[in-house]
Amino acid sequence: DLNILIAQSEEGNPDAKFYLGSLYYIGRELKQDYSKALELFKEASERGNIAATFNLGVIYAKGRGVKIDEKKAFEYYKKAAFGGLPQAQYNYAIWLREGRVEDPKPIEAMEWFKVSSNKNFDRSLIELAKGYEDGTAGRRDYREAVKLYRRARANEDNRDNSPYLNSTFYLGKLYLRGLGVAKDEKKGLRFIKEAANGNVNDAIIE
């Protein structure tokens, strides 16, 4: 109930502040208001709600109701990553690898992909698998890559989303080449076709 949520938020409940902020952010049940969302997320974050901290990172990264501020976004992603949120750990790792705010730190980024993968976060599983394919995860290990792609693939309820389709594509390539798994061209092509049908660009090019 919205009234209960508002009352709990006014009493200082960080989770209520986070959920109320989310409603303002997406404009569900309440008129979309990025300023109110920002205020509530800040209050929730200060009271220890890690998801609110992550959302602050998204707001500053995308410029939702504020000027884009990558330095602030990076700090919020970092705080939420250290707070244990897998999505934040993934975003923080991407920004570390790309050198969005600081100099690129690919080794540290890979460690964060590993941490997030331990919580079965699909996009991190894919990045870690790619790291085992190209050796940036510390060693080249195609069998480990296959395992990780399979985990990312199995992790998805909705087969239309990008982590499922991307892991299907990369797994298909390994089946085609017989790397880390018994060579199976039929299966490999089937997987790549499935990814292409889902508009994975690399699969369409392949």
Regions found by a protein language model. Name each.
Residues 1-26:
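N-terminal segments that cap or nucleate solenoid repeat domains
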Residues 186-197:
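TPR/TPR-like (Sel1-like) alpha-helical repeat modules
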Residues 10-13, 26-28, 33, 46-49, ...:
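Short helix-capping/linker turns of helical repeat alpha-solenoids
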Residues 8, 43-44, 79-80, 115-116, ...:
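Canonical positions in the second alpha-helix
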Residues 19-26, 53-62, 91-98, 125-134, ...:
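Hydrophobic face of amphipathic alpha-helices that form TPR/SEL1-like repeat modules
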